[in-house]
Amino acid sequence: MFNVYEFFNRINEVRPESRLDAGQPDIPVRREIIEEAVESLRRGETGYTSTGGIRELRERIAEFEGVSADEVIVAPGAKILIAAEIASAKKVAVVSPRWNAYSLIARQFWREVEVIKTTLDERWIPRVEEIKADLIIINYPNNPTGRVLSGKEIRGLLDVAEENGVKVLSDEVYAELSFTRFTPARELYENVVTVKGFSKLYSMTGFRLGYAIGERNEIRRIQRFIESTVTCVPPFVQRAGVKALELRDELIKEVRRAYLERVRMASKMLRGFDFVEPEGAFYIFLRTPQDGMAFAERLLSRGVAVFPGMAFGDYPNFIRISLSGKGLERGLRVIREELECALESRATEGWEGSSRGVSAEGSR
C-alpha cells in the first residue's frame, strides 16, 4: 500500500516552491478564534473536561445541525471518531477513491476492507447492488475527486445500505465547502453516524477538533471508546471551537467563495484534460497520460508537489492537486506544461518531461 505520509515527508525535505499536495488550508485561522484559545488558557482552563465535550459547544453544534445536544459528541479530531466506528465493525466497506486513513485505521484494528471502486468515466458515481460489510464509509464532498452526489445518487447508495442492514459512516468534513446542493446522508437514512470537523472551513487543522452526530445509544458507545483512548478535548480548544461557530455563517460565505474562485481558475487552466470539475472541497483528481507516480516525481523535480493517485486507492494514472497551498498558479502552469509534454511523447519509448528548466528553489 502506498504510504502517503512517507511521501509527504519527502516533499517536506525537498521544499518545493508550489505546495499542491496536502489538504492544509492556507486561509489563516481567524484572529478571534486564536484570541479565544489564549484567553481560555489565561483563565486557567487547562484541565480535563467531560469526555463528550463541554455543553456549550455541543449545544451550538446541535443548533445548526438540527439535532439535540445528546446526539453530539466532541473529540480531538475526526480520525478518532472514525476509528471508534471502524473498531465496532467486523468488515468495513469504503467508496474509492478515498482518503487513505480509512484503510489505515481498519488495518490497525485488523478489519477486512471491501473496496467499492468508482471511475472517472462514470463521474465517480458508486454503482453497487450489494454491500458485504456491516459498515460503509462515504465521503462527500469527496476527497480527492471533489464530487458531490446528487440527492438521487446518494439515495441510491443509501437504499442499498438499508437493504443490506449496513451502518453508514458519513464523513462530511467538507460539507460547508459544497458549491452545489449537498444532501446530508442522515436526512435519508436512520442508521447513519456523521463525522465533521473544524479543520477545513475554519483552517483549525492543528487544533484537532472534530465531532460526530448520531443516535443517542451510538453516541454513548463512541463516548466509551473516547474514554478508553484519548479521554477528552482540551478546554481551550473547545472554547476556540465555540468562537469559530459564532463566525460560522460569515466564514462559510467567505471561505466557500475563495475556494470556488480557485476551482474555477484551476479548471480553466487545465481545460482539455481528464477530470470532473469539483463540486465541493478544494481538490482536482486528474488523469495523467502516463504513470501518476512518475508524473508526481517529475513535478516534484520542477518544484511542484502533488499526491499520486495511488494515495487514494487503485488509481495509478491519476494525481490529486490541492488548491489550498502556496504557489498555486505557478504550479498549475507547470502541471499543464508537463501534461502537454506527456501527451506529445505518448507514442515514444519514454517520457522525460518538459524541457523547461527545474526550479532552483524547488529542487532544494
Curated annotation (Swiss-Prot):
* Swiss-Prot/TrEMBL GO biological process terms: amino acid metabolic process; biosynthetic process
Name a single GO cellular component. Answer: cytoplasm
The molecular function terms of the Gene Ontology recorded here are: L-aspartate:2-oxoglutarate aminotransferase activity; pyridoxal phosphate binding; transaminase activity
Q: Enumerate the catalysed reactions.
A: L-aspartate + 2-oxoglutarate = oxaloacetate + L-glutamate
Q: Which CDD domains match?
A: AAT_like (cd00609)
Q: Is Cytoplasm included in the keywords of this UniProt record?
A: yes
Location(s), subcellular = Cytoplasm
Q: What is its EC number?
A: 2.6.1.1
Q: Where does L-aspartate bind?
A: 23, 99, 143, 320
Q: Which cofactor does it need?
A: pyridoxal 5'-phosphate
Q: Which residues carry this modification: N6-(pyridoxal phosphate)lysine?
A: 200
**Pfam families in the record:** Aminotran_1_2 (PF00155)
**PROSITE patterns noted in UniProt:** AA_TRANSFER_CLASS_1
| InterPro entries associated with the record | Aminotransferase_I/II_large, AspAT/PAT-like, NHTrfase_class1_PyrdxlP-BS, PyrdxlP-dep_Trfase, PyrdxlP-dep_Trfase_major
Chief location bin: cytoplasm
Family the UniProt entry places it in: Belongs to the class-I pyridoxal-phosphate-dependent aminotransferase family.
- Quaternary structure and partners: Homodimer.
Q: What is the protein's given name?
A: Aspartate aminotransferase
